[in-house]
Amino acid sequence: MSMSHLYGKDEDSDGVEMENFEITDWDLQNEFNPNRRKHFQTKEEATYGMWAEHDSDDERPSFGGKRSRDYSAPVNFISAGIRKPAAEEKSDSDSDSETQSRRENFPKDFEAKKLRTGGNFKPSQRTFAGGIKSNTDFGSWERHTKGIGQKLLQKMGYMPGRGLGKNAQGIIAPIEAKQRRGKGAVGAYGSERTKQSIKDFPVVDSEEEEEKDFQKEMSQWRKEPGGGKKKPKYSYKTVEELKAKGRVGKSLSAPQKEISQVKVIDMTGREQKVYYSYSQLAQKHNIPGEAPGQGVKEEKPQGFALPELEHNLQLLIDMTEQEIIQNDRQLQYEQDMVVNLTHELEKLSEVLEREDKAIENLSKVLETVEECERRIQPTCDNPLTLEECARIFEMLQDKYYEEYKMSEKADLSVAIVYPLMKDYFKDWNPLRDPNYGTDVMSKWKNLLEEGHLSHSAHDAAMDPYHRLLWEMWVPFLRNIIAQWQPRNCAPMADFLDSWVHLLPVWILDNILDQLIFPKLQKEVENWNPLTDTVPIHSWIHPWLPMMQSRLEPLFSPIRNKLSNALQKWHPSDSSAKLILQPWKEVFTPGSWEAFMVKNIVPKLGMCLSEFVINPHQQHMEVFHWVTDWEGMVALSSIVGLLEKHFFPKWLQVLCSWLSNNPNYEEITKWYLGWKSMFSDLVLAHPAIKDKFNEALDIMNRAVSSSVGAYMQPGARESIAYLTQTEKRKDFQYEAMQERRDAESIAQRGIGAAAAVPMNFKDLIQSKAEEHNIVFMPLIGKRHEGKQLYNFNRIVIYIDRGVVFVQGEKTWVPTSLQSLIDMAK
């Protein structure tokens, strides 16, 4: 664009040309004016440039006069101000009137159209430059032609109202022109796309992209196109990013002296570097963006570099970042502190509420206790009964359980319950009414018993219920037992059976060991089996289920007294068997057999030695005296007596009989008769079988040795038949016995398989049954939540397959076999 019309001289400028670079309305109007005056550069101007000489005709319009320019003056530019439009500069009224009269001579349609831009353009004026009018009659001349174009399109498949193309993708409406708002260049006023264009082609075209790039470049119009410094790119760091990054390690406070000043020479790079601390050496590989105060190394030297200012700015930035981080930490700390204090306040509020409730409950409990103390006074008109006191304790246990557990129940029961309990049992006779008071004591056991074990009366932490029994009930029982006669055992045994579930283990042991056993021991010492009409087992055996092994010290003196009584005994006296028979299951097998061998077997042997065998007139009383002891005396002892004192005489009588022409039929009957006198258990013994088989052999030899002599007809056959019959019976008996043994073994196997213990408790129970040991739970007795059991006299509990036995001060684990040995 030519700017020569802006050069001129002012009156005060001393001939210095001034050029204004501002874009005026004249520039905008004549930029797109095809009829503007063009200045063609001459040869001289091309050669000499601005120093070329110009003719007066070639002078460009300017605001200055026609005087010649002073080229010796320095070049200077002055502001031209706001230039008026070219149409307003024409002030020659003659030329205007001439031009107006000339235009009126032309038709209106052929009048030259002025290019309207900006505010002079109206949307209603839809005319093109050059006089062509755009209206609905455009192309109407085609109505008077043959319309060959429309026909050709229809032959090619065109359908009116649809677009062109295979898929009718062409536009239907004609291209719509959009008039620019102002007088600027194309795109100066934004996108010039019409609504139809946007609808048909919604994709942004390259012109719009170029428009965006142009607007971006226009914002940097002050920079030179190809040189200068590029636009700086600013990176912004939000507070959230700074918090997330948490640059904790950068301390921008006053630099502290390092613990050790060490000079470090770094020769790992291309150049030798010296550091004065290990921290500086550790920061040498830091990323430039991460290290404080270190800028990015510039490839080109900076023309305007202020390192001190940059350092200070970076220092301010780091200090601000650290302040933000510290403030965030402080805020987080305060928020956490608020949360903690809130929780603490809630907890303290709950504690305060619980304490208030506890104070209220304790006040009510105290009032109730004071009321009970007032009513137990002798001068009270409404005395407290034991039933009412039990209901009060139940109410305290139900409504104020925590306070009831925390209270000293022992002191409370001593002060209130003991006087009432003494008054309740003052007229009671346990031997007459053994069940009296059991329901009352059962209720008080549930109210006062705490569950921990008390082992003796000297235990400092004695259970209140145990203390109640020990201090009130046991002294009363001592007086009753002191007057009790052991031979009248039934009332006392029934009484203890009724109270055993209410008595603690240690109190029951104390009663049995300190009160009952001494009375029994003294009575056994005074017992005389020869003069006493009451059998001793009648007043000793009722205590066996309860005392069990506690009575073993009494068995030895009882056996001694019985032995002394049997010294002058004869087997013909059957009373001895009646006295001894109840003790067979009480004494141990070894002690019982030893007692029989010492006191009974010699007497029976003496009777058998005096026994006379006479086939013609046999007396069986002596033999029956011996066989009656078969269940009392061991089988081996009975067989020994028969082998020693009976069968030698019996075989001798048989031989004598066979040597005197006997009647074999009578001998056979005699043989079978004696054999029927023995039980199957005795006959099954091998020694007894051998003796009877020996008798058969003697009979067979006697028959076979009498060849040629006179013999009873059929005797040999009869003896042979008897022999075969006896052998067959023995074989059948042995087979039957083997079958019974096999069946019993199978039954034991099935029973054992069916009785396989499911847990350790079942195993202990099965072992107790095998060894005849009482194994039963102690009702209401627990230790650390585990049920306590009574294994004979031993108190045990089971924990995860291990048996714990109660010792003197603690619980001791033990094996099952050791437990069985201890119980025996």
UniProtKB/Swiss-Prot annotation:
Domain of life, per lineage: Eukaryota
UniProt keywords, alphabetically: mRNA processing, mRNA splicing, Nucleus, Spliceosome
GO cellular component entries: spliceosomal complex; U2-type post-mRNA release spliceosomal complex
Any GO molecular function: nucleic acid binding
Residue ranges occupied by any G-patch domain in the UniProt entry: 145-191
Keyword Transmembrane among record annotations: no
Pfam families for this protein: G-patch, GCFC, TIP_N
Feature: compositional bias, Acidic residues: 11-25
UniProt feature, compositional bias: Polar residues: 122-135
Signal sequence coordinates: none
Oligomeric form and interacting partners: Identified in the spliceosome C complex.
Protein name per Swiss-Prot or TrEMBL: Tuftelin-interacting protein 11
Record organism: Xenopus laevis (African clawed frog)
Gene: tfip11
